[in-house]
Amino acid sequence: SPNTPGLRELQEKDSLRKILTHLQSENLKFDPSTGSGPKPILLKIAPDLTYEQIDDVIDLALEIRLDGLVAANTTISRENLLTHTSKLEAIGAGGLSGLPLKQRSTEVVKYICDKTEARPDDPFGRGKIPVIASGGIFTGEDAKEKINAGASLVQVWTGFIYEGPGI
C-alpha cells in the first residue's frame, strides 16, 4: 500500500523471500484435525517495480511455487495526469488506480508472461505461472487487451466501483 510508509520495501527480493518462504511453509502443512490443506497463494505486485525487480519476483514465485501473480496493484506515479500538481499535493500520498494504471499494468502482464514462457500443454499458451491482470479494466476491450497480453484472468475493481454492475 502506498499509504503505509516502508511497506513497498517488502517487495524487495530479500524481504519478499523471507515472507513468502515462511508463508508457503506454513501453508503446505496439512492439519488432520481440520482436514484443511494448502490454499492458493498469489502475490499482487506494484506497477512501479523495475524490470529487474519483476524478474526477482518471477524467480521467487517459481522457486517458492506460488499459485499466481497479480499485476498490478496501485501506483505511486502521477505521470501524465491532467490534475494540477497543487491539487495532487493537497490530496496527498496514496495509491492511484483505474485508467492511469491501464498501460503499465498491461506492460507488466506481458513482461511476466513473456518471461515465464508459454506452456505447450496450455491451449491458450499461458506461462509457467498464472497471471491475473488488474488495473485500468473498464470495458470488455480492456479485459481482452489483458488476455491478449497473456493474462489468465482479469480482476476488475475500480471500473466496477465507477461503472457499477453494468460494466
Features from the language model and the residues they span:
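Generic structural signal for well-ordered alpha-helices
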Residues: 13-24, 54-59, 106-110, 143
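Alpha-helical structural signal in soluble globular domains
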Residues: 22-26, 30, 59-64, 111, ...
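Loop-centered beta-sheet repeat module
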Residues: 1-34, 42-44
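Glycine- and other small-residue-rich loops at beta-strand/loop junctions that grip anionic moieties
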Residues: 8, 43-46, 98-101, 132-136, ...
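Glycine-rich phosphate-binding active-site loops on the catalytic face of alpha/beta enzymes
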Residues: 68-78, 137, 143-167
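Catalytic cores of alpha/beta
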Residues: 49-63, 118-127, 137-154
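Short beta-strand/loop segments at the ligand-binding rim of alpha/beta enzyme cores
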Residues: 28-49, 114-133
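Glycine/Thr-rich beta-alpha phosphate-binding loop at enzyme active sites
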Residues: 2-15, 66-129
